[in-house]
Amino acid sequence: MKKTKILIASAIVCIATFVAIAADHIDAPAVNGGGSSSLTDITDFYAFQGSSGNSIAFVANVQGFIAPGSATDNATFDENVVIEINIDTDGDASQDLVIQAIPRDGRMYFFGPFASTSASLSSTINTTAALQGDVAISGQTAVTENSNGIQYFAGPRDDPFFFDFVKYSEIIGGTATSFDNPGDDTFASTNVLSVVVEVPKSMIGGTGSINTWVETKRK
């Protein structure tokens, strides 16, 4: 499984407990039933060095297989779901920093990165985090915000994942033994909802390498 920012009024996002949901392109039991459960589905998670070389970009994609056109225009983040990016800076496989993202009324609100002392399947929005920010959720035109050196984006993007799911199913079912070269990209021309946070490396710290993963948690 692929695992898987500045000051705003804390009243905008109410404090609530969120419980973790497992996902990976709709094949996890918690999200393969469709309906509201699919809104927590994590399709992919990416982390890479930013263009300046002094930052790290974290990209969490949710709600895969969104068709172009009206389906993408009408796709929305679930306001009862928080996206949590976990960052392990010391190599002990436990998060040291967390970035939370939750939508409200057409905007995505971010909290962190802030220090995390323990791992848990449930979370509370850290409305007292020193680093906070928000960005309008994009439509056809991408909207970004930059504050305190942290950049934010939330909205629909083309799904970059390449996978021949039909051939994969045939291999699992015993009717094929290998993938074709080239294969057919099942995800071509489909979209996802993306949350992107680009953070200065100085805010991450650590020894130079990190472990990172993402979770969705439902209220």
Q: Predicted segments — roles?
A:
Residues 22-219:
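Surface-exposed extracytoplasmic segments
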Residues 1-22:
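Gram-negative bacterial Sec-dependent N-terminal signal peptides
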